[in-house]
Swiss-Prot record:
Mediates selective neuronal growth and axon targeting. Contributes to the guidance of developing axons and remodeling of mature circuits in the limbic system. Essential for normal growth of the hippocampal mossy fiber projection. The lineage of its organism: Eukaryota, Metazoa, Chordata, Craniata, Vertebrata. Keywords: Cell adhesion, Cell membrane, Disulfide bond, Glycoprotein, GPI-anchor, Immunoglobulin domain, Lipoprotein, Membrane, Phosphoprotein, Repeat, Signal. This is Limbic system-associated membrane protein. The modification Phosphotyrosine is found at residue 94. It comes from Mus musculus. It comes from the Eukaryota. Its main location: membrane.
Length: 341
């Protein structure tokens, strides 16, 4: 705040004398401002504010005051604040310059002028605007599906920032309002992802921060395909599941767990698993079970590896020859002599 400094005791009589000449008893600190009302000056935090005051003649005695006291009396600076100085572009100007304005500088400032005829005052109200700044936001959170979630986003600024929440999905659904809290009741897996908090006012660009919401849910088999195989060749069964955390996979046959050994190979990545038979034999045909599990649940799917029988070449030739003869007989019917009795 632009304040004042106590004068040296030795100089106190001289200072008091100056003030008595400059600020006569009963001087009103009100908005008569040379026939004008109070001026409002709006400045953004960190910028420089210039409070204008122009006198009628060089002999006028001038002072700047605010709610804290005297800032300048004539050319004598009473304020300790190094940001404050006089600005005189010409002989009749007695403006006040405040550098790096902050919120505590906001308020009423009075330019008091003592002329040869009567005292006058010019009052200026300094308004300090502050860009929006998010001061507190929820940390990333992990919850189970069906839980209630509350996200918090608090911001400072002048004017008061408007808070907007948005779920960062392809649809980009926004939750409009001046609410610092976003409540999600019975959250679903589709509502997981990043949530963006935006604090905005008219001073500058918005301040934006994000919160990541992870929703845990039990596994669900999304794809499982049976497969046909040929004896002596390689064949695979594949199983896919959706879950958070990512599921662990196991393979079974006839209630016996299968491991990667004896010509069988299991490969599992996040969300999918495969069982590969490197050299199919008759004993490999049959039913298999894919099991997907995480800390919230377990599910399974049944798959079948079945035989693919190839047709032999002679059989196909016989069919073709038969069809050829049959068609020929239709085109050229045989002539048969009647039986003699």
């Amino acid at each position: 705040m632009v304040g004042r400094v106590q004068p040296d005791r030795k100089q106190l009589p001289l200072v008091l004398l100056r003030l008595l000449c400059l600020l006569p008893t009963g001087l009103p600190v009100r908005s008569v401002d040379f026939n004008r009302g109070t001026d409002n000056i709006t400045v953004r935090q960190g910028d420089t504010a210039i409070l204008r005051c122009v006198v009628e003649d060089k002999n006028s005695k001038v002072a700047w005051l605010n709610r804290s006291g005297i800032i300048f009396a004539g050319h004598d600076k009473w304020s300790l604040d190094p940001r404050v100085e006089l600005e005189k572009r010409h002989a009749l100007e007695y403006s006040l310059r405040i550098q790096k304005v902050d919120v505590y500088d906001e308020g009423s400032y009075t330019c008091s002028v003592q002329t040869q005829h009567e005292p006058k005052t010019s009052q200026v109200y300094l308004i300090v605007q502050v860009p929006p700044k998010i001061s507190n936001i929820s940390s990333d959170v992990t919850v189970n599906e069906g839980s209630n979630v509350t996200l918090v986003c608090m911001a400072n600024g002048r004017p008061e920032p408007v808070i907007t929440w948005r779920h960062l999905t392809p649809l980009g659904r926004e939750f409009e309002g001046e609410e610092e809290y976003l409540e999600i009741l019975g959250i679903t897996r589709e509502q997981s992802g990043k949530y963006e908090c935006k604090a905005a006012n008219e001073v500058s660009s918005a301040d934006v921060k994000q919160v990541k919401v992870t929703v845990n849910y039990p596994p669900t088999i999304t794809e499982s395909k049976s497969n046909e195989a040929t004896t002596g060749r390689q064949a695979s069964l594949k199983c896919e599941a959706s879950a958070v955390p990512a599921p662990d996979f196991e393979w079974y046959r006839d209630d016996t767990r299968i491991n990667s050994a004896n010509g069988l190979e299991i490969k599992s990545t996040e969300g999918q698993s495969s069982l590969t038979v490197t050299n199919v034999t008759e004993e490999h045909y049959g039913n298999y079970t894919c099991v997907a599990a995480n800390k919230l649940g377990v599910t399974n799917a049944s798959l079948v590896l079945f035989s693919k029988y190839a047709k032999t070449e002679p059989d196909s030739m016989q069919v073709i020859e038969f069809l050829h003869i049959d068609l020929k007989s239709i085109r050229h019917p045989l002539k048969v002599n009647p039986i003699q009795k």
